[in-house]
């Protein structure tokens, strides 16, 4: 259940769900999702379901990953992207397929270590990982053409808004128990926000995880 054909069927399903961006679809068929899930769950890697990855975190279902990637890309490849919440590293690997540089911040050290090994295995070398509080962003590498959050926040942290480049886009889930997917775009006059689908993500937690 981890063959190229299995991935192709996943991509066919994504097309029927409204994912039309060829660069995103190519990324989804290129990156093997089963590498990013627990071995015991590998047989479900290409089902359209979120799966647990330990530390009370999950790997998002393929449609959500593709949908957020399509919204972030918006028809053209971004130069520099910031991901808040590395998690399993799957979204990170997808972003790396169509971005010049990806910076990914994760508060849980063991997850970051696993992701580093997985990216090395796939020979993905345009990603920089950092163990830090994602709510602070990554000011030393700002501004970013795109920012994506893989955990929900009720309010957008000011630091992340400041680190978004002019004409940049941010895709994130907003809310607590009830959540919606949002897109923020920055222009010379300020910020505009578009509210989209209902979603369900783990909450964004401040600070760095301590064992």
Swiss-Prot record:
PANTHER family tied to this protein: PROTEIN-L-ISOASPARTATE O-METHYLTRANSFERASE, PROTEIN-L-ISOASPARTATE(D-ASPARTATE) O-METHYLTRANSFERASE
Known role: Catalyzes the methyl esterification of L-isoaspartyl residues in peptides and proteins that result from spontaneous decomposition of normal L-aspartyl and L-asparaginyl residues. It plays a role in the repair and/or degradation of damaged proteins.
Annotated protein name in UniProt: Protein-L-isoaspartate O-methyltransferase 2
SUPFAM superfamilies in the cross-refs: S-adenosyl-L-methionine-dependent methyltransferases (SSF53335)
Lineage: Bacteria, Pseudomonadati, Pseudomonadota, Betaproteobacteria, Nitrosomonadales
Similarity remark: Belongs to the methyltransferase superfamily. L-isoaspartyl/D-aspartyl protein methyltransferase family.
Keyword list, A-Z: Cytoplasm, Methyltransferase, S-adenosyl-L-methionine, Transferase
Enzyme class, spelled out: transferase
Cell compartments where the protein resides: Cytoplasm
Cellular component, GO annotation: cytoplasm
Primary localization: cytoplasm
A Pfam family of this chain: PCMT
Reaction(s) catalysed (UniProt annotation): [protein]-L-isoaspartate + S-adenosyl-L-methionine = [protein]-L-isoaspartate alpha-methyl ester + S-adenosyl-L-homocysteine
Transmembrane segments: none
